[in-house]
Amino acid sequence: MTGLDDVYRARFDERRRRGKMSVWAEIVAYLQRWIDPERPVVDVACDAGYFIRHVRASERWATDIRDVSAELPPDVHFVCTDGLHLRDALRPGYFGTVFMSNYLEHLESSRQVVEQLRIACDLLGPGGRLIVLQPNVRLVGGAYWDFIDHHVALTERSLVEAGELAGLRTVRLVTRFLPYTTKGRLPQGRRLVRLYVRFPPVWWLLGKQTLYVAERPR
């Protein structure tokens, strides 16, 4: 077991992981509007595959620094690698969507954040989209640093700036979207989550994570 395995096992018990599965089914259903189901999708730093198992796509790919292949559906193509080495592991220009959730804050520097977004841009075909769910330090405040493996502080503005430096064009930016963690105030149960994502006014009350959708220019 790696150090990361120890961290995540302590952070998320089995009951909470099962709860996240049902929450993510509705989050992905909402995000699907920006995802072309006729093109391949890759989930970077996929963890237990909360996103990739629910998305509709012509091919489903997932990557993580840990070998989580046993936790993923059998049709998901899994690559065990660091996100900063994806150019060596995946075909450039192949994907219609690259997805990242609660990942960029784990990188070591803002320079690595820009480089990771450049890599995502390279993986996308023309018109392909990057979707990022990102804790926003301006909204979260000091609790952003409650996790020992958080290194980079990002707001909606710095996220957009990093995307522009990486060659991406912003399609949609929702500063307040999801609560900070599933341990917090996000409604539990699929029906409540479905209502939450369909009622933007409540995002302004509970949202601490930013939704960023960007496109590789055609």
Residue ranges and their predicted role:
Residues 1-93, 97-101, 114-117, 210:
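Conserved N-terminal segment of class I S-adenosyl-L-methionine
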Residues 14-17, 84, 97, 108-125, ...:
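S-adenosyl-L-methionine-dependent methyltransferase catalytic module, highlighting the catalytic core
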Residues 102-106:
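Short catalytic micro-motifs in class I SAM-dependent methyltransferases
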